Amino acid sequence: MNRLLVIAGPTASGKTALAVALARRLGGEIVNADSQQVYRGLDVGTAKPTAAERAAVPHHLLDVAEAGEGMDAARFAALADAAIADVAARGRLPIVAGGTGLYLRALLHGVVAAPGRDAALRARLEEEAARLGRPALHARLAALDPDAAARIRPNDLVRIVRALEIAAGGTRPSELYARHAFREDRYAARLLALDPPRASLHARIDARVAEMFAGGLLEEARALAARFGDALPPKLPIGYAEAIGCVRGELQLAEAVRRVQVAHRRYARRQVIWLRRERGVEWIAPPFDADDLARRVENG
């Protein structure tokens, strides 16, 4: 079983910088576990590692898919497995860095064996969501499987559609998850989660979002709008819909910045809640001392 170090935590908590620092000290390479950083061309709005960080330490699973291309936890886990095996085979330490809970869970504990995808049904459900609204599909799921609906936010179209797709095959999604229970340990993983105080995290989030809008997010949004027109991908990373609204003249810049700051703060809260439910998490309070953490990792 391959040894693995995982650096998790809420957005803007400093995962990337710490992962790079630890990789340099421990002879590691970084495997991305951020569901939005896999997409090419979405760099500023997803806070990808800088060119300097990527030059300092090898990174894997960045820019492996096109915007709008399907990427789910199962595909991510398969790609990550291959990257981790490659890093370990060269005598390096794989360091998984990211805050996407579904991806981390799939990698560490496996994925649920669910019925295959039905492209026609998915297209029909997505059309209904566009016509009736996502909450209408969520309500339909709640009628079929209240437990599954309770675990999915009413605006999370990707997960709602997948749950309805499973239910259409005669299986309750909640029963599938209950049977799996994510008990399997696929790696000898040490999971460190960064735990900054809420006030300082919110300040970092607000500053980062302002920097995104000043540092190229609008240009990325303009390129997306030119590429896709009115047929934008249904699940863009946080901030791109608002930035596209700005470049189209539908939203004032200050209001767009405010909305994205709020969205990132809410996302950070969900990430923390997710990690609190996971087993084996070591919470790390600031300051995040890379030398101290490297010694702790080396000493087991």
Curated annotation (Swiss-Prot):
Q: Does the keyword Nucleotide-binding apply?
A: yes
Q: What ranges does the record give for the region Interaction with substrate tRNA, renumbered to this chain?
A: 34-37
Which EC numbers does the record give?
Answer: 2.5.1.75
Q: Which SUPFAM superfamilies does the annotation name? A: P-loop containing nucleoside triphosphate hydrolases
Q: Provide the binding site for substrate.
A: 11-16
Q: What cofactor does this protein call for?
A: Mg(2+)
Check the record and name the Pfam families matching this protein: IPPT
Q: Which UniProt keywords apply?
A: ATP-binding, Magnesium, Nucleotide-binding, Transferase, tRNA processing
Enzyme class, top EC level, equals transferase
What job does this protein perform? Catalyzes the transfer of a dimethylallyl group onto the adenine at position 37 in tRNAs that read codons beginning with uridine, leading to the formation of N6-(dimethylallyl)adenosine (i(6)A).
The record's HAMAP family line, in alphabetical order, gives: IPP_trans
- UniProt-recorded name of the protein: tRNA dimethylallyltransferase
Specify the species: Anaeromyxobacter sp. (strain Fw109-5)
